[in-house]
Amino acid sequence: MELNLSEPGQSRYLRVYEYYKELIGSGQMKPGAKLPSIRKCSLQLQLSRTTVETAYMLLAADGYIISRPQSGFYVTDAVLAAANREEIEHGVPHQEERPEIRYDFASSNVDRESFQFDLWRRYVKSALRQDERLLSYGEPQGEREFREALCAYLGRHRNVICTPDSIVVGAGVQSLLHILCPMLRERDSAWFFNPSFRQGRQIFEDYGFRTGDIREYWENNDRRIESSKKGLFGIEKPDVCATEMKTGLSEQMSEAMRHTGKSVCYLTPSQMTVWGEVMPVGDRMKLLKDAAREDMLIIEDDYNSEFRYYNRPTPSLQGLSGGRGVVYLGTFSRLLLPSIRMSYMVLPPDLLKRYQERGRFYNQTASKAEQIALCQFIRDGHLESQIRKSKKLYAAKAKCLCDAVRRIFGEKARTHLGDAGFLVLMELDSPLTSAEIAGRAAQAGVAVRPVESVGSLLEKQEHHFQEGYPKLLLSCASMGAERYEEALEVLKEVVYKKEK
């Protein structure tokens, strides 16, 4: 670029500015290069010192050069950052727009009809009127009154053994795991039975834990299969003798833990699969016995425990253990609204002592106003009423979805209902894979979740899953039941359009 000062139309200081800006931006002047002094530049260009000084000040203001006292002006490293920023802002590849989803069978949202917004609004307004309480920060462990209400509720409904002092409140399970993991330094590995909670697993990895999948370990380390049979959880195990018990989670876990030292086991016994299989009491007791023998800490995420449609809720592992050796986690995201970020953790005595030594260093992440509101909401009995209403609604919607599948697909599809949760498993008679169907459905505006293998499902005797048949998980939660049939008609067209 040549500096032309004779053309009219632009101030001379701007031309000097543009000239050096181009030299620096193009790399002809490298970071650290020295510019001519103001006096020398004014002589070379035959300009006044004021004109050159103004141009230099503008370059410095924009980050291209820096003034060093008693030394002069130098090109800055910020130029490289500016170039990188421009490349990032303008060089990002165009992302293909996703198709609009009209029918959402994959959402984890809740049904609007399941929640009494006006009632909750009343409790929030009442909490916001407590001016004096809201002028201070919340208690690091959670508001005392809220923990007292939680303690009473958990004891009544989940047989959890706790006191208000053993409960820690946080904004979501992940925030609580960030408190828990540093207290488990003597344990070096964390095992997960259900790999779908990737966010939790990532936190353990971030804190240096080796993580593994119990099911995968079992399958990769037992190659002695001669005559085999399906175990209680769908895992093949050698038939050592004719009277051998079916292989359950406890056996799989004990075998894995026996070779890994002091470990942590993270599981959701009230929803062992995404579609709602529940760990039986017998397996829970066996697991607790083996965990005590192997010095294994269990983290029980009691997700969706309230949503047992057809049977009474199974007692929590924490309660069955007598309150020792188990960390109990719970959340209100499904019972209330996902946007109400309120979770809680019940610590066993040994970990509670550690928390009390360092708990003051943690700030409370959950809203103080929402804790106050939810405390009174629970005390007035509305949480239990909310559970009854939600269970009735989602049980009816799940049945409605199964009926709609039968009407639309006939003998070309089968449905399976789990013991809990919001999902219906659908098996299709089609040569397409689950992923292919999900991809085509998305293009047609229908969101579904593919299931790639029977191994990811816990198999009960009443369910006979077929290998080779595509399987989809359909959520009955967020979409209105009146739209099920029209959505399934679109899905059927996607699956069988080649057969016409």
Question: Regions from the language model: what does each represent?
Answer:
Residues 70, 319-354:
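Active-site PLP attachment segment
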Residues 47, 64, 209, 296, ...:
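Short glycine/serine/threonine/alanine-rich loop segments
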